[in-house]
Amino acid sequence: MLTLPEYNEQIPNVRSLLTKWAKVERIQDVQDGLQLDVRLKTDTLLELHIYYDHVYHVPSIKFRLWSLDTEEDISSLRLLTLSDSELRSILNLGTFSVTLSTDMEMKSVYYYINNCDTDANVGSDVEHYLTRWISLYIRIFDLNFVP
């Protein structure tokens, strides 16, 4: 577990690591976290939100994957769902689980990475907690990510 002040102290380090990720097109600071647009493939965009979970006191991820469809010079984005084989082929979930839920504040649907086992996966040592966390969890989206 990580207190909000500890999280806020470490989030600039995560931002610094993610700016080195070649696939990031945009990174924005938001309240208690970061929002990224990541080009996973030529026609696949990852909308990624890193935020502090005030209930579990751990960093968390919510995301959406979009497929860029172009037909007769008209482009549109299509939200990918877990039933899309395209989405399942992109995610490297391993033992991680995701759930689909509505973000009431944003009035939008997102996938959430289950954060119940965060401390077991990352360890409870506060020093460099977020660096260890991002190094593990970002690999869900890019196995080649190296912090």
Curated annotation (Swiss-Prot):
Kluyveromyces marxianus proteins are shorter in length and have a more ordered secondary structure than their S.cerevisiae counterparts, which might contribute to the superior thermotolerance and solubility. K.marxianus could be therefore useful as a new model organism for further elucidation of the molecular details of autophagy. This is Ubiquitin-like-conjugating enzyme ATG10. It is found in: Preautophagosomal structure membrane. Disruption phenotype: Impairs the formation of preautophagosomal structures. It comes from the Eukaryota. E2-like enzyme required for the cytoplasm to vacuole transport (Cvt), autophagy and nucleophagy. Acts as an E2-like enzyme that catalyzes the conjugation of ATG12 to ATG5. ATG12 conjugation to ATG5 is required for proper localization of ATG8 to the preautophagosomal structure (PAS). Likely serves as an ATG5-recognition molecule. Changing residue 116 to A: Impairs the formation of the ATG12-ATG5 conjugate. The active site is at residue 116. One of its GO terms (cellular component) is phagophore assembly site membrane. Changing residue 110 to A: Reduces the formation of the ATG12-ATG5 conjugate. Changing residue 56 to A: Forms the ATG12-ATG10 intermediate, but reduces the formation of the ATG12-ATG5 conjugate. Belongs to the ATG10 family. Disulfide bonds: none annotated. Its EC number is 2.3.2.-. GO terms for biological process: autophagy; protein transport. Forms homooligomers. Interacts with ATG10. Interacts with ATG7 and ATG12. GO terms for molecular function: ubiquitin-like protein transferase activity. It comes from Kluyveromyces marxianus (strain DMKU3-1042 / BCC 29191 / NBRC 104275). The lineage of its organism: Eukaryota, Fungi, Dikarya, Ascomycota, Saccharomycotina. Keywords: Autophagy, Membrane, Protein transport, Transferase, Transport, Ubl conjugation pathway. Changing residue 118 to A: Forms the ATG12-ATG10 intermediate, but reduces the formation of the ATG12-ATG5 conjugate. It is a peripheral membrane protein. Pfam families: Autophagy_act_C (PF03987).
